Regions:
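HotDog/MaoC-like acyl-thioester-processing domains
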Residues: 1-15, 95-147
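Catalytic strand-loop segment that frames the active site of acyl-thioester-processing enzymes
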Residues: 2-60, 141
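Generic detection of short hydrophobic beta-strand segments and adjacent strand-loop junctions
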Residues: 21-25, 89, 135-137
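Short, intrinsically disordered, mixed-charge
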Residues: 35-39, 74-78, 125
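Short, intrinsically disordered/low-complexity patches at protein termini
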Residues: 43-44, 55, 83-84, 89-91, ...
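Hydrophobic beta-strand-centered segment that forms part of the acyl-chain substrate-binding groove
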Residues: 51-60, 65-104
């Protein structure tokens, strides 16, 4: 899925507004993340090692899931100009190589000064919740200086 970044005025958001994003977590994504961050933990990149663990196979980095939340917040909802204030992330289950995850974001509160609380829930194809949490963001529209 390609996300097209757009700026949305802060007053155009409503509580209950949702956005859904799907992503295949494949070997290329995991190895790219390992190279980018330097996190080459064997549980992520070594099939032989991972088979000997309780997981029985390689698992994706938790940071990949966090990054997907950031990608959707900044690119789709709320969109271009969104600024993170905080993010609570809970990891509930592993994401394995070639799992497809679905992220659903829901605006749960609109606060003063263009701040929003956004519930984040990520599931894999089985329906199992793998990540959840709450993002607090500054909504788009306030970022640019007035002309």
């Amino acid at each position: 899925m390609v996300i097209t970044a757009r700026a949305v005025p802060p007053n155009d958001f409503v509580v209950g507004q949702k956005c859904t994003y799907h992503q295949l977590v494949d070997d290329k994504l995991v190895r790219g993340y390992a190279d980018l961050t330097g996190d080459h933990n064997k549980i992520h990149v070594d099939d032989v090692f991972a088979k000997k663990t309780k997981f029985g196979q390689r698992i994706a980095h938790g940071g990949i899931m966090f990054g997907m939340i950031s990608k959707v917040l900044g690119g789709e909802m709320p969109g271009l100009g969104t600024i993170y204030l905080s993010q609570l992330v809970n990891f509930h289950a592993p994401v394995f190589i070639n799992d497809t995850v679905t992220l659903e974001l829901t605006i749960t509160a609109l606060l003063p000064k263009h701040v929003a609380k956004i519930n984040c829930v990520m599931t894999k194809q089985s329906g199992e919740v793998v990540v959840d949490g709450v993002a607090t963001v500054k909504l788009p529209g306030w970022l640019m200086k007035k002309a």
